[in-house]
């Protein structure tokens, strides 16, 4: 076994996929601004958050298995 440090390719691929998900990120950021002052706790941006990460995960999944051994 080599002494090289193992690098997680998923983290690198996530960074490279973020530019493809700008629309979802902007929707999430707009939502967080809208609900910022909500004292009741009923408003949230869970849907937009998951939409953003779904976009990134979909992009990463197409490339990730090429990097795994």
UniProtKB/Swiss-Prot annotation:
GO terms for cellular component: mitochondrial inner membrane; respiratory chain complex III. Component of the ubiquinol-cytochrome c oxidoreductase (cytochrome b-c1 complex, complex III, CIII), a multisubunit enzyme composed of 3 respiratory subunits cytochrome b, cytochrome c1 and Rieske protein, 2 core protein subunits, and additional low-molecular weight protein subunits. The complex exists as an obligatory dimer and forms supercomplexes (SCs) in the inner mitochondrial membrane with cytochrome c oxidase (complex IV, CIV). It holds the Pfam family UCR_hinge. Belongs to the UQCRH/QCR6 family. SUPFAM superfamilies: Non-heme 11 kDa protein of cytochrome bc1 complex (Ubiquinol-cytochrome c reductase). It is a peripheral membrane protein. Lacks the acidic domain of other UQCRH. Signal peptide: none annotated. The keyword Disulfide bond applies. The keyword GTP-binding does not apply. Disulfide bonds join 17-59, 31-45. It comes from the Eukaryota. This is Cytochrome b-c1 complex subunit 6. Component of the ubiquinol-cytochrome c oxidoreductase, a multisubunit transmembrane complex that is part of the mitochondrial electron transport chain which drives oxidative phosphorylation. GO terms for biological process: mitochondrial electron transport, ubiquinol to cytochrome c. Keywords: Disulfide bond, Electron transport, Membrane, Mitochondrion, Mitochondrion inner membrane, Respiratory chain, Transport. It comes from Solanum tuberosum. It is found in: Mitochondrion inner membrane.
């Amino acid at each position: 076994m080599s002494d090289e440090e193992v690098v997680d390719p998923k983290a690198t691929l996530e960074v490279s996929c973020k530019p493809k998900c700008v629309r979802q990120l902007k929707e999430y950021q707009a939502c967080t601004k809208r609900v910022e002052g909500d004292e009741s706790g009923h408003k949230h941006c869970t849907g937009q958050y998951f939409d953003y990460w779904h976009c990134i995960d979909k992009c990463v999944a197409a490339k990730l298995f090429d990097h795994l051994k």
